[in-house]
Swiss-Prot record:
Gene name linked to the record: ygiD
Protein name: 4,5-DOPA dioxygenase extradiol
One MF annotation (Gene Ontology) recorded for this entry: zinc ion binding
NCBIfam families listed in its UniProt record: PRK10628.1
pH dependence (UniProt free text): Optimum pH is 8.0.
InterPro entries, alphabetized: Extradiol_dOase_DODA (IPR014436), Xdiol_dOase_suB (IPR004183)
The protein's required cofactors: Zn(2+)
Role noted for this protein: In vitro, opens the cyclic ring of dihydroxy-phenylalanine (DOPA) between carbons 4 and 5, thus producing an unstable seco-DOPA that rearranges nonenzymatically to betalamic acid. The physiological substrate is unknown.
Length: 271
């Protein structure tokens, strides 16, 4: 077992698991309801010894994990102010934690990525508010685009063990994410279907039963599911956090809101 994992495995404080609605990259530069919520989480939650991030913006064929000592800050967006591109989040990586994930997720093959990726705005865009000093070791786990929703929920179950090792699970996405219907100007009130789906998610956070029957695994069965998520990558991170729930811990909503008609900023806290 690697030294880092040996050190943290005896942690007596169970770390929470978070799903954060990250929204626009502009949140990095702004002070608003959502960014203040992320700041409060960083100030009030137990400080983790390391963080595993699942971001909507690393959507791959197969599963990968960042395994470099100093992951780069990825500015995976275009058309924003230069100040955003000048912002970096130099949190250290953790090859030891990456190797721990390889062992924990076996027999699922996990590729150790030492050069292709880093921390994208789905991860650093929220963590720069939670932990602005960028001094907590982090790895980012990719989302396998070839797998069904139930598989991602089960991945959360596997990752749950890390919470007892001093490691926080942070998943970043948006449960309603339809950029084709975003209201860029004028009336920005939520579409009825966006509100309906957002409420459906909230109502089923504590559902218990067979994974294959979970309403949030079968989210496309909801009448607003496809409109709310024409592609799955921003929704699936939620399932990692729900999979890490033990069925008894409190589930709370640190902040919520729907911006520009069809962008949910709902956040969910486990523990």
């Amino acid at each position: 077992m690697t030294p880092l994992v040996k050190d943290i495995i005896m942690s007596s404080t169970r770390m929470p698991a978070l799903f954060l609605g990250h929204g626009s990259p502009m949140n990095v530069l702004e002070d608003n309801l959502y960014t203040r919520s992320w700041q409060k989480l960083g100030m009030t939650l137990p400080r983790p010894q390391a963080i595993v991030v699942v971001s909507a913006h690393w959507f791959t064929r197969g599963t990968g994990v960042t395994a470099m000592e100093t992951p780069p800050t990825i500015h995976d967006f275009g058309g924003f102010p230069q100040a955003l591109y000048d912002t970096h989040y130099p949190a250290p990586g953790s090859p030891a934690l990456a190797q721990r994930l390889v062992e924990l997720l076996a027999p699922i093959p996990v590729t150790l990525d030492k050069e292709a990726w880093g921390f994208d705005h789905g991860s650093w865009g929220v963590l720069i508010k939670m932990y602005p000093d960028a001094d907590i070791p982090m790895v980012q786990l990719s989302i396998d685009s070839s797998k069904p929703a139930a598989w991602h929920f089960e991945m959360g179950r596997k990752l749950a063990a890390l919470r007892d090792e001093g490691i926080m699970l942070v998943a970043s996405g948006n449960v309603v994410h339809n950029l084709r219907t975003v209201k860029w100007h004028g009336d920005s009130s939520p579409y009825p279907w966006a509100t309906s789906f957002n409420e459906y998610v909230k109502a089923n956070l504590t559902w218990q039963g067979p994974v294959e029957q979970h309403p949030l695994v079968n989210y496309l069965d909801h009448e607003g599911g496809t409109l709310s998520n024409p592609t799955p990558e921003h929704y699936l991170p939620l399932l990692y956090v729900l999979g890490a729930w033990d069925g008894q811990e409190p589930i709370t909503i640190p902040v919520e809101g729907i911006e520009m008609g069809s962008l949910s900023m709902l956040s969910v806290q486990i523990g």
